[in-house]
C-alpha cells in the first residue's frame, strides 16, 4: 500500500517539478596515509596540508595518518565529486612518496603502538580532541580506530519541507515537523540499511596483521600463508564485530522515536560513570588519558550507522545544537571505501543514496520497539557476515524471507522516488543507478565485496597486495590529474589560513584545561 507521504510527494512534485532539485549533500571521506610498501605512515601530518584542527577541507580522524576530506554543502553532484577530486589532487602534491590507502580496512599495521594518535596543537580544543582519541584507544584499541569509511550528509530542499509542512496542515512549528520526519527517515534507515551493506560493502577480507594476537574471530585464511583472513560470503566486515563495534555500548538503547529520548539517552551515557573505565586517568593530578570515565566521553563515541545532525556553533556540543534547533540533516556512516572508484565512491552511488534516503523519508515509519531493533540488528549482522550466501534469509514482516526477494521489493519502492528525482532533473540517471543495484541483487558476483575476492583469488593477491594495487593506481591517477589554478590557489590559501587560525586559538586560551572541560560538560548537564 502506498504511504501518505509517498502519495503526497508524487502530487506535490507533479505540480512543482523542480521541488526536488535542491537536495543538499556533503561527503566526508577518510583515507590512511601509507608508505610505498603498504605500511601505515608514521610521519606527522604534512605541513602543506595546513592545520588539521582548523582546515575546512582536510583534517585527521583518529590517527595522525588517517586523513579526512570534507566537501562543502552543495546541491550539485558533479560539484561535490569535483571538489573531492580537487582535494585528492592537492593532497598528493604534499605526500611525497606516500600514498592514500584505497580500502576501508587497514593496511599492514604493527599493533596499537604503530597507530599514532592525531595531534592538533596546544590549545584547549586541540588537547580535548587528542585526549578523546587516547580514550578511544584505551577503551576499544587503536586498531579499530584505523578503519576508514565514507560519510554521506543529506538534506532535502527547503522548498520540499515548506510544501510538505503546508500540505500536512502546518500544525506546530515547521522545525518540529522537519525533526519528526527526519526521525522517521532514521527509523526506516535502520530497517533497510542491510541493503546498503549488501550493495556497497567492500570489506570482505582483512590483512592478518589487523587481527594479530586476537582469537575472538571466526575468519578463515584465504591463502596458504595466512596473510589474508576473510569470510567467503561477507560484505562489510568493517560494519561487524571486527570493525566499528563496542560491547560496552550494546546495552545503550538509543531511541529514535522522539528527539527528547535520543538526547536524554546520550546525555545520561556521557554523564554517568562506567566502572570499567575508571582505570584510565581522566584528570587526576592533571593526567588525562580520557575525557571522563563515563560510557561515552562525548556523543561522537556512540557508534551508529546514521546520525541526526545540526551544524554546531563554535564550542557547542552536537547534542546542544540538536536541542537548540532540531535536526538539520542526517549523516550516513555505513559506507565502505570503494577500491574500484578513484574517490572511494562515485556518482551512481550518490544517486542511489538520494533515492534510498528519500524513500526512507516518504515511507510509513512506525515507532521502533526494542524487540524490533533486536531483529534489525540481527539482519544487519547477518548481511555483514553472510550477505552473499546463496539462499540467505532475513527476518521480515510475516517471518523469514530470502534476501533477494526483500531486496527486490525494496528496490521497487526506491525506483519510485528515483523516478521523481529524474523528473525533477529531466534525465534518467537515478533510475539507471537503481537498475545497477538491481543487477547486483540478481548476480551477487557484481557486488564490490565479491569483485574484491574474485580478483584476489584470480591473481593470487593477499589483501595488502590488492590494496597496494589500487592505492598505486589511484595515486598515479591523481598525480597526473590536472588541478585548476584557482582550485590550487584556494586550497593553498586555506592551508595558510588554517595555520594562522590555529596560532590564534592557542594565543586566545585563558582557561586551564580542567576548567575548559568543566565548562564544556556543563552543556550536557543543561540539556
Where does each model-flagged region fall?
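A glycine-rich phosphate-binding loop feature that marks nucleotide/adenosyl-phosphate handling sites
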Residues: 106-108, 206-210, 373-383, 430-440
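Extended, compositionally biased alpha-helical segments that mediate assembly or anchoring
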Residues: 427-527
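Histidine-centered divalent-metal-coordination microenvironment in nucleic-acid enzymes
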Residues: 30, 144-157, 329-336
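Generic recognition of stable, solvent-exposed alpha-helical segments in well-folded globular domains
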Residues: 26, 82, 86, 127, ...
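Loop-rich catalytic cores of soluble enzymes, especially ATP-dependent carboxylate-amine ligases
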Residues: 121-138, 146, 155-322, 342, ...
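Short conserved micro-motifs at the rims of enzyme active sites and ligand-binding pockets
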Residues: 42-45, 81, 114, 164-165, ...
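Terminal catalytic/cofactor-binding subdomain
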Residues: 1-137, 144-148, 177-187, 191-194
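Substrate-recognition/cap regions that form aromatic- and gly/pro-loop-enriched pockets
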Residues: 323-324, 330-422
Amino acid at each position: 500500500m502506498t504511504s501518505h507521504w509517498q502519495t503526497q510527494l508524487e502530487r506535490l512534485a507533479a505540480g512543482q517539478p523542480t521541488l526536488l532539485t535542491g537536495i543538499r549533500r556533503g561527503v566526508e571521506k577518510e583515507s590512511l596515509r601509507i608508505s610505498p610498501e603498504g605500511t601505515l605512515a608514521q610521519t606527522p601530518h604534512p605541513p602543506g596540508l595546513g592545520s588539521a584542527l582548523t582546515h575546512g577541507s582536510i583534517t585527521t580522524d583518529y590517527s595522525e595518518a588517517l586523513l579526512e576530506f570534507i566537501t562543502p554543502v552543495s546541491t550539485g553532484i558533479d560539484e561535490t565529486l569535483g571538489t573531492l577530486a580537487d582535494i585528492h589532487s592537492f593532497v598528493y602534491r604534499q605526500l611525497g612518496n606516500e600514498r592514500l590507502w584505497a580500502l576501508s580496512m587497514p593496511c599492514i599495521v604493527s599493533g596499537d603502538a604503530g597507530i599514532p594518535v592525531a595531534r592538533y596543537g596546544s590549545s584547549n580544543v586541540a588537547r580535548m580532541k587528542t585526549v578523546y582519541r587516547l580514550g578511544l584507544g584505551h577503551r576499544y584499541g587503536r586498531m579499530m580506530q584505523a578503519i576508514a569509511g565514507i560519510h554521506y550528509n543529506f538534506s532535502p530542499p527547503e522548498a520540499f519541507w515548506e510544501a510538505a509542512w503546508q500540505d500536512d496542515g502546518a500544525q506546530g512549528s515547521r522545525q518540529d515537523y522537519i525533526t519528526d520526519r527526519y526521525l522517521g527517515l532514521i527509523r526506516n534507515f535502520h530497517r533497510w540499511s542491510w541493503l546498503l551493506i549488501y550493495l556497497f560493502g567492500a570489506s570482505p577480507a582483512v590483512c592478518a596483521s589487523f587481527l594479530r594476537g586476537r582469537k575472538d574471530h571466526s575468519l578463515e585464511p584465504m591463502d596458504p600463508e595466512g596473510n589474508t583472513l576473510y569470510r567467503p560470503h561477507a560484505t562489510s566486515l568493517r560494519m561487524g564485530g571486527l570493525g566499528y563495534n563496542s560491547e560496552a555500548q550494546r546495552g545503550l538503547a538509543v531511541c529514535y522515536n522522539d528527539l527528547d529520548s535520543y538526547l536524554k539517552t546520550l546525555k545520561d551515557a556521557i554523564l554517568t560513570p562506567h566502572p570499567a573505565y575508571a582505570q584510565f586517568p581522566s584528570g587526576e593530578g592533571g593526567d588525562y588519558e580520557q575525557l571522563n570515565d563515563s560510557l561515552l566521553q562525548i556523543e561522537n563515541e556512540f557508534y551508529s550507522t546514521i546520525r541526526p545532525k545540526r551544524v554546531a556553533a563554535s564550542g557547542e556540543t552536537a547534542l546542544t545544537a540538536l536541542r537548540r534547533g532540531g535536526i538539520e540533516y542526517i549523516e550516513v556512516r555505513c559506507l565502505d571505501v570503494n577500491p574500484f572508484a578513484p574517490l572511494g565512491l562515485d556518482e551512481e552511488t550518490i544517486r542511489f543514496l538520494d533515492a534510498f534516503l528519500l524513500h526512507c523519508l516518504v515511507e510509513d515509519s512506525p515507532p521502533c520497539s526494542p524487540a524490533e531493533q533486536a531483529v534489525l540488528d540481527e539482519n544487519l549482522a547477518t548481511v555483514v557476515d553472510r550477505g552473499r550466501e546463496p539462499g540467505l534469509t532475513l527476518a521480515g514482516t510475516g517471518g523469514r524471507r530470502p534476501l533477494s526477494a526483500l531486496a527486490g521489493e525494496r528496490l521497487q519502492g526506491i525506483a519510485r522516488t528515483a523516478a521523481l528525482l529524474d523528473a525533477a532533473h529531466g534525465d534518467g540517471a537515478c533510475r539507471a543507478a537503481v537498475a545497477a543495484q538491481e543487477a547486483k541483487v540478481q548476480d551477487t558476483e557484481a557486488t564490490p565485496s565479491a569483485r574484491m575476492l574474485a580478483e584476489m583469488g584470480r591473481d593470487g593477491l593477499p589483501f595488502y597486495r590488492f590494496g597496494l594495487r589500487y592505492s598505486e593506481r589511484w595515486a598515479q591517477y591523481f598525480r597526473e590529474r590536472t588541478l585548476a589554478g584557482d582550485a590550487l590557489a584556494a586550497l593553498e590559501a586555506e592551508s595558510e589560513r588554517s595555520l594562522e587560525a590555529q596560532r590564534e586559538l592557542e594565543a586566545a586560551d585563558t582557561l586551564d584545561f580542567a576548567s575548559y572541560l568543566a565548562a564544556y560538560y556543563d552543556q550536557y548537564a543543561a540539556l
